[in-house]
Amino acid sequence: MLEKVIERYLVQRVKAQGGVAYKFASVAHRGVADRVVCLPGQTWFVELKTTGGRLSELQKVFREDMLRLGQNYAVLWTKEDVDQWLLTTTK
C-alpha cells in the first residue's frame, strides 16, 4: 500500500476522533516525522511507512530524540496499524 494512502487514512481517522494531523516538514532537519498528530490531551509525532519500509538512520535519531525528551512517537505501516494505534491512544 502506498504511503500517501495510509497518510490520507490517518488524517481522516484522526479528524473523526476530534483531532488534527499536521503535515510536518523541516527545511533545516531531515528525518523528522511525517505528521504531528494532536488528539484531545496528547500530541504525537507519527512516521508513516509502506509495508516492509524501514526508518532511515536520521529518522531513528529523530525517534530517539523525541523519546528521550518524553514525547510520543509512533511508526505506522498499514491502515490496520492506524486503527490499532487510535484505539490504544484514545482510551
Task: Specify the residue positions occupied by each region the protein language model found.
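Catalytic phosphate/metal-binding cores of nucleic-acid and nucleotide-processing enzymes, i.e., regions
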Residues: 1-91
